Amino acid sequence: MDNTAITSQSSSTPLVCSVTPIIVGSPPSPANVIELSSPSTPPTPLTLLASLSETPSRKTTNPDTNGENTICHGVRQVRRVPRNNPVTGPSKEHKQRTRSPKTTTRREIKIVEGDRLIVGHDKREKKGETTKRMKKRDGVADKKLYARVSKVKSSENLDLDAKIPSSKVCNNTLPLVGDDMDNGSSELKLEQAIKRRHDWTPTREVTTPVVDVAELHSSPCGKAVTRMHGVGTLLSDYGFSGVVETSLGTKSESFRNAPTTKRPMELQKFSTVPAIPTPTESSTTEDVQGSSSKQQRVKAKKPQKGKLTTITSHATAKYCVADQTVDLDYIQNVAPKSPRRKNISNRPSGTKHSNSGRGKSSTLKNDNGRPVFRVVPPLEAFKSFEGQELLFGTSSQLERGYPEYPCDETQDTQNSPSNSAAVSELAVPYRISSEGKDLGSSLFGLSGSKNLWSASARDLTGAVFEGDEIDFQGASMGLSVLATKSRCHPGNRGPPRRNLVDVDNVPDKKLDIDTTEGENGNHSSVADNIVDRENLNPKISANTSETNLECAPQNKPAFSRFTTSELAKKVAAYGFKPIKSRDNMISLLEKCWETQSKTLILESKPNQGTDDARKNGFRKENHSDVRVRPDSATLANRRSPKKQQAKALSKFQEPNNFLPIENSTTTASMLPIISSHTILINDDQLSDSVGETVSFLPSLDHNGNGTTIQENMLEIKSPATPNARRSRQGSSSASFSIEPPSLASQITKAIKSQPRTRAFNGLKQPTWYEKILMYDPIQLEDLAAWLNTDGFGRIGEDREVGPGVVREWCESKGVCCVWKKQVSGRSHYLPMVS
């Protein structure tokens, strides 16, 4: 009930106000009642308002309690109570009005524990109603006392406070919050109300409250302190008090050095690390640590500078120094060195003399140990770009990475007559004229060359080259051995065999010309030509044998200069088992070479004899009715008289075949021979494109003069190549013997039959078949040289192949192949078959 309601009802209802102070621990006494007004004289509204402004409000709050001095202030409460109507609820007090003017006096006192004590006339009220009313008023009183601020007693009650006996005062007092009030309300000495929180989340207490148990037990008011601490703690959780602010402040102060979730742990290292010393303050221990760390870095980098075994390491070896980045640790270690030198120079004479040698050696080692980083000028940087090479790419890019040769060699190749030197280069897979320069730079890749073959590091057999076992003299001799074998072998093309006369074809055609003239009356010319031919054949055979004999002993390789690995490869190439002794390998290779050179000399003569026998046998079958005449002196010694007679008859009767009027049957039988020669020469023109011009017979001479016919057929402006001779021999022999297997199948068989060689120094030597499976680009010249020297010998194949045939085989099988060197566009397509 507020003041307006009291004012409106004060005229009709007499009020009795009384204050009863009660001390905790003492029974209440009705004698301590001071009535402010008499019931006989009710106050007027003006006096009531004046008394309300000076006295406390009608409701009470928690008394001022400090833990030691527990003083309960009784607060006068004005109530308007109906006489004989029980109060059933707080809302009925406003609605119900009493008709009788008789009033009752009720004194209500609030104690700390929340109990109520009513002192007054209880005779006019029933006990049941009173107790029931009091139970309902408990909740109302609790709610009203919880949220209001009570005023302190006025000056009229000061005398009453003096009469109240004071209890023992405790030290732990709760101060009154009245300092921040206004001047007008400072006399009231109000206690600050608890602030409400808008969000009902209790504040977490970081600091744990510490309670001294001994002090509580020693103090007489310890029980009250603990009791008030429990109530205050519950209420402070829902209000903004100073305890929460101080707890936040103590948290930041107490945990200043502790790590938090948002502070990285690495920052704590800076608190323990001492300050960076200046160069003048640096000690010898720092220098020792710097040198030790430097040595550790050098040791860590040393294993990377081992033997270069890959293409990438070979290619990037010369760029390693330029690609090194700046070492910041090294720059920091250089700074303390300069003051140390000054200290050495400023030392006394005795100390300087004793440590001068060590100091000097250490400085020299430090200066020469690591190269000084130098910034390259722009012009030099651009020049270095020009020197760089394209290292990786497709097979077409690899094909362009040919070794660099001098320009004079290419000019000599272009200016040679009928470009025969270009043809001979196929038989010699490596350059011999520039052995001292190109072997070290372009083939082995040890002097920083700029081609791809040096980076691949392949040896003469096409296997991976071993860089630590290089012998330039032995390698050059190995090249010369391959070159001489290719030159001296009758199947290969070379400069010594370039200008030889074909004994089998040219004299026969001369004989045909002369015998035709003899049939017309000039018989003496036939005998003269036969004599000339007999004289010519021994000379030519002697010349060929001399060239073979001269070619073999001069080019005998010096096996003593070969390395052990090369000797083992040579022994394995001949089909022998590995030999441990170096001397035994050298002696075995010399014997093998001697026997091979002898077989090469002897093979040249039987080949000529067999070719003549094949031709004569072909002519004998076609012409059985001819006279016997000796062929030549050299062939007469080896053959039986029957073969000599048959050959002589065929040679003597051949000119008659060219006269169609006299003998038409012989003309018809001879036409296939003419057509076969014509077709073969025409094929040589298409395949070799050497530039041969042969004028063929447009029509036969019906007058019987066949000289013009033979002259036109033999009008060849350029010498016939060995390929043409081989093709003639093959065509003539193929018609009477079983055709041999194709070269493609023989190449496949030879490559698959190559045995696996031993690994030298832990490096495996792959075979040709393994290289093909690994998609390693196959060099056509190397594979052709291996097939002619070793591959075909394992499978019993006598023929030989050139790079052109090998290229056709590679393209048919899908093998990646490249040319080792490019001499001209036409030479790549020259097939070489024997």
Swiss-Prot record:
Sorted UniProt keywords: DNA damage, DNA recombination, DNA repair, Nucleus, Phosphoprotein
UniProt keyword Nucleus present: yes
InterPro entries: Slx4_ascomycetes (IPR027784), Structure-sp_endonuc_su_Slx4 (IPR018574)
Modified how: Phosphorylated in response to DNA damage.
Bias type Basic residues, positions: 296-305
Biased composition (Basic and acidic residues): 611-630
Main location (coarse class): nucleus
CDD domains: SAP_SLX4
UniProt keyword DNA repair present: yes
Composition bias type Polar residues, residue spans: 279-295, 345-366, 412-421
GO cellular component: Slx1-Slx4 complex
Listed Low complexity bias regions: 729-740
One GO BP annotation of this record: DNA repair
Pfam families recorded: Slx4
Molecular function (Gene Ontology), one example: 5'-flap endonuclease activity
Membrane-crossing residue ranges in chain numbering: none
Compartments (UniProt record): Nucleus
Region spans: Disordered: 80-105, 272-307, 332-372, 401-421, 603-649, 720-740
Subunit (UniProt): Forms a heterodimer with SLX1.
Function: Regulatory subunit of the SLX1-SLX4 structure-specific endonuclease that resolves DNA secondary structures generated during DNA repair and recombination. Has endonuclease activity towards branched DNA substrates, introducing single-strand cuts in duplex DNA close to junctions with ss-DNA.
Family: Belongs to the SLX4 family.
Protein name according to UniProt: Structure-specific endonuclease subunit SLX4
